[in-house]
Structure formats: C-alpha cells, structure tokens
C-alpha cells in the first residue's frame, strides 16, 4: 500500500470558508478521472522527499522511523481524528483524557490523543471571526451615520406595515451577513493576518463603540432611537457570537491564550475617532490627527469591499424596520422630530436649500481596478491619467457622523437619494414653475394683442367682401335681364328641336315596337314548335314504352316457345330413338322370320329325312347316324354356349353403348340448353342494342332539339344585343347629332344675333338719316310755305303707325 506524503490537511472547515469554484472543479475532475484510486494521500508535516509516494511496509521507511516511537501514533491521530471540535472533550487537556476518565457509555476509542491541528484550525477560525466582527461593527457605524425618511407611504400605513418590514429586514440581514461572511472568508484566506493583529483590531473596535455610545447621548431623540435599536441588535449578535466562540474553542489553554493576547481598550477620552473619508486618490480628510489604532482600523476597513448601492439600501431598510419593531415610543418621538425636519424646507421655501456638495455624506470608495502589468501597460490611454486627476481634484462632502448624519429620502420615482439633492430638486422645480407661470402670462398677453390685431384685419376684409358682393349683386341683376331675353329665344329653339326630336323618337319607337312584335311572334312560333316537339317526344316516349312492353311480351313468348320447342325436340328425339329401336326389332324379327321359314323348310326336309331315318331306325339304320348326330349335338351345344357367351358380351357392349349414348344425349341436351341460352342472350343483347340505339337516337334528338333551342335563343340574344348595340349607337349618334345641332343652332343664333344687331344698327342709321332728311324737308317746306306739298310729303313720309320710328318684332328680326 502506498501513501502520498504531500497530501494537504483534511480540514472540514476549508470547504465552508474557502468557496473556491476552481478547487471544487479540480476535485470533481480528479474524482471523475480516478474514482476507484487505491492510493490515498496521508497528512504529514515532513518535508518533501525524493519520492512522492512512500509505503509504510517498506524496510527503508521502517528503518528511518525506528528511532521515532511516536511516529505511528502521530500518523494514526492525524489520519483518524475521532473528536469533534464542538464536543465536550475539546475543553479538556489531552493528558486528562485517559482510560480511567472515559465513561463506559461513551462510544469513543480509548487512549487516543487529541489532534493538534484542530487547535491551529480554531485559531485561524477565531482570527476570521474577529475580522468579521470588525467589518460588521464598521457597517453598523455607517448605518448610524445615515437617517432615512420614507416618503412612499402615509403616516397611517406605518403601523400596519411594521411586521412585514421586520420580517423582510430579518431575511435581508441574514442574506447580507452570509454574503459578508463569504467575502470576508475569501479575504481572510488571501491576507492571513496574525493573532496579535486580530486582537489589536478588536481593541480598536471596542474603542470605536465606546466613543459612538458616549457621543450619541447628545444627538436628537430620533438618532437615540436608531442607535438604541442598533446597539440592541449588536448586543444580541455579540452574545450569539460569544456562544459560537465558546463552543468552537478547543480548550481552556487555547481560550486563555487567545484572551491574554487581547489588548485593553483605550479610554473614551483618548479614543474618540473622527471618521475619515478617503478619496479615490487615497488621501484622508479629518479634523483630528489619526492614531496608530486608527491606522490599523483603517487598514482593516480597506480590506473590506465597500457595500454596493443595493446593500446600502438593504442596510437602511433594516435600520428602519428595527426602529419600528423594537421601540414604538422611539417611533413616536422619531415622527415628532421628523415632522419639523420635513417642515423646515416648507417654512424656508423662499430660502435656498443646502448645497448637496456641503451636506454630510457617508464615505464610499469604489473598488480599485487592477492596473495593467503586462506589455500592454506601455500603451496606456492618456485619458486614464487625466480622469484620475479629475477624480482626485473633485471636491468631497463632509463626513457624516451619528451627531450629523446623512439625510436620505426614499421616493417612489427615484428610489433612495440624498435629502439635500431632493430639496435642491424641489427648489429648482419651484423656481422653474414660477418662471413658467411668468412666461405663460407674457405669452398670453402677446397672444391676446396679436388676436385683437388679426380680428381687426379680418373685419376690414369682411367689409371689402361685402362691398364686392353688393357690386356683384347689381351686376347679376343687370345681366339677368339680358339672360332672360336670350333664354326666351333659346327656349323657342329648344321647343322646335324637341318637337322634331319627338317625331323622330316616335318613329324610332314605332320601328322598335314593330321589331319587338316580330321578335315576339318568332318567339311564339319557336315556343309552338317546341310544344309540338315536346308532344312528339311524348308520343315517342309512349311508343317506346309500348314497344318495350311488346318486346317484353315477345321475349316471354319467345322463351316459352323456346322451352316448348326444346320439349318437342326432346320428345321427337325420344320418338326417333324408339322408332329406330322398333325398326331394328322389326328388322330382327323379319330376319328371324325368314330364318324360321328357312328353318321350317329345312325342318320339313329334315322331317322327311327323319321319316326316312325313322324308317331306317326301324330298320336300325340310325345307329351310326345317331352317333353322328350326338357328335353334331355336342358340337352344336358347344357352339350354343359360345353364342351365349358372345351374346352376354354383346349385352355388356350394348349396355356400355347405351350408357355412352345416354351421356352423349345428356351432353347434347346441355349443349342445346347452352345454345338456347346463348341464343336468348344474343336476342337480349340485340334488343338491348336496339333499345340503346333508340334511346341514343331519342337523346340525340333531344340534344339536337335543345341545341336548336339554344341556337335560337343565342341568335335571339345576339340579334337583341345587336339591336341594343345599334340602338345605343343610334342613341349616341342621335345625341351627337343633337349636340351638333344645338351647337350649330347656338352658332347660328349667335351669327343671327350679330347679324340682327348689325341690321338694327343699319336700320337705326337709316331711320336717323331718313328722319334727318324728313326734318330737313319739313324745314324747307315750312320755309317755302307750301302746306299742300308738305302735307303730302308728311303723309308719304310718316309711317302707318303715326310714329317717327319703324318697329319690328322679335320674331320678325329673328326670322327675317
């Protein structure tokens, strides 16, 4: 078995404190690579040798360890620690834990020394806890240096929401403490400060807490309530931490050694610390010279990452919840004290608010970015140094203290923001609203003046429009009379044109009526033909049904006759067969008759011979003949037997022949039946073909008839559309003729008017010249005193109407 002598200490708290993702990933990768590794690493304080892996079973290793008696015991204790750090045995010395001091019911190995590396672990953990306490107390101090006013809820809702806020703050405090512990554990692993430094840091925190409690008595009632609630929370947390530290302490000796190293706290008179604010450049600003403890505290505070904006909000919300849940009287006093604070800006509305740059503020330092150290650091942007200089040159706010806390306001629109900024925004908004009101008043005056000016201009324009309308009205009255005269003339022309148009229209209507009557007559003829064709179709259908009935009757009769014919044929065949048989029998009988006749004749001859034989018998001459006859009879009997056998054979042949003939008869009958069925099928097919041909002919006739009807309709529709198109074209032409006629009439009227006007002018000139001549003649007659001639001249010159002028009517002028 091999053991790795370079294995790290198997500390159970390292995984909880060092939450390093890289180590866990490496361990997981190592476990995946070798999950069943037999070689294990062992804890050892020995320096690294030449070989990484050493076996305790080798002779060299045993020879090197012979002088050290405690080697095996120490290795065993380091490898198998059986006592927990939180057990009751951790407060006792290892020498007191012998065989006699262990009770019987204790399930623990006997005479095993307490592992010494756990004491080092306890010291390291105690150092980390002290660092966490320092950071937590610093955060509480920063919390006291801030005061939050919640403007998102009313005063009536404050008492209702205390329980929910307390629960939320408790959960947020647990989460913040866990996050701070994790961050502090990481920092503790990196920095690894000594025990003496940790004790000095605890002394510094003790001095800071005493100074804050001594100075907090001079603050207002609201800050007292906040500090009391925070002190109570810290006391509870300190008690809990004391319990944890007592349970985690190893023994009396280690606890005493840890307490001895703690320095005595500095008195509150000498240890009053003014909090400092560090700029981004690293400089500190305070009114008091920092002491050594303050410097150490500053170094410890710098190690802690400053809380982000969200963590600050959570801390402030926790402070508010603790104030509401723990001290209701402190709430009332806080409300009384907060109301004058919030009413101060209202009473001092005319005064300018506090400058946000002069308001107290909790110092906050952003995490410093790592500077470039590689080759690219040579090409630093020039803007980075200028920005750093500008950041260092920026003025900072005064440091907030519990006596002079930073006032923060919580709003719905902007969340958490400084009260000075909030007052500044409200003050600027008020000034802006006043400026807007003044601007609106000035703009309204300008608008009213401009509106009045525009109204006057509009009134002048309206007066001009009225004058123009009056003049237009007078002109319309003058022109309306002229228009009336020309209108009357045009009306007469239009009446004549309409009369002519109506005459033509009547002619066209008569023509269309005649065409319509003709088309209707043609339509009626087509309908009559269609009805006749329908009657013919009905007759054909009736005839078809009758033919079908006759066909069915004929088919039934044919089938019956065919059956009767088959039966008669069968009977005839039977009769023929019987006749053939009878004829054969007759022939056979005739043959037999002839044979018998011949036999009788022969027998007669034989009888005569027999008589002669008898005579010879009597004469005893028959004996040789008898012998011959017997011989013949025996031969004949043999022949008879042969004939009988042949007859039997012929009978068997006859039965076979009859059977064959019967089979042939049946086959012939089947063939006759098949032929009859085939004949019937052919007749049916023929009739079906004839029926289909007749139906096709009827269908074709119907289609032809429908096609003729559709053609007639199509021709009718085409003719109708042609007539309509012709009518439309004629109407268009008529309309064009009308328009042309009206245009020509208008031109003619205009020409006639101009001609009439010229004629009127000429007539007027002629009348004037005639009157002038008449006046001259009358004047000459008067001068010559010839009354008779003058009377004659006057009677001849004067018109019939006894007037100086000749009047012509409008019709005479138009149709002259």
Curated annotation (Swiss-Prot):
Residues 292-316, 770-792, 799-816 have a biased composition (Basic and acidic residues). Residues 83-92, 246-260 have a biased composition (Polar residues). Residues 18-32, 161-223, 327-342, 380-396 have a biased composition (Low complexity). GO terms for cellular component: cytoplasm; eisosome. Residues 1-34, 65-101, 154-406, 770-816 are annotated as: Disordered. Coiled coil: none annotated. Residues 317-326, 343-353 have a biased composition (Acidic residues). The modification Phosphoserine is found at residues 286, 343, 347. The modification Phosphothreonine is found at residue 809. Keywords: Phosphoprotein. One of its GO terms (biological process) is protein localization to eisosome filament. Pyrophosphorylated by 5-diphosphoinositol pentakisphosphate (5-IP7). Serine pyrophosphorylation is achieved by Mg(2+)-dependent, but enzyme independent transfer of a beta-phosphate from a inositol pyrophosphate to a pre-phosphorylated serine residue. Present with 10300 molecules/cell in log phase SD medium. This is Uncharacterized protein YGR130C.
